[in-house]
């Protein structure tokens, strides 16, 4: 993805990996120069059919800042996935047999108060709450294909489990960290 970004003229910065996704994300935020931040991973995309809706959303004048929670369609090959919604052909990008939803803030104004927290399953929501920035919803989905590749998914799940253990060790009273670790552990069969 680094090479693809360079091919399209993007400025590409490198950072040493510190076993903490929030550090890497915050480094990228520090390099951003536009008015808006849109968080997207290499195995994710927005459908071209939604580009105009997306442009209209960020082009709207607003009296007060708003961050947008966006639904991610996590495509899967497994029929027993909790919350599975079968593909309907609504999007050409659909993969696998269906998808399960997850929502998180991915679009927000470039504001130094907004930073990611947590070494794994990193979020900006706590920073938004602290800054008093409301969260609005967006009806443009992000299409996530990472769960379609079994070998990579297993490797990633193991890595996330290790990071989850570190996260829980840092805050032993965090029910969210305990829940995330339980899910990751179940996925790797431990």
Regions found by a protein language model. Name each.
Residues 1-14, 18:
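Acidic donor-binding segment of Leloir-type glycosyltransferases
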Residues 7, 26-36:
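Active-site nucleotide-sugar/metal-binding loop of Leloir-type enzymes
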Residues 19, 35, 114:
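Glycine-centered loop/turn positions within well-structured domains
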Residues 22-29, 40, 46-189:
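Catalytic-site signature of metal-activated, phosphate-bearing donor transferases
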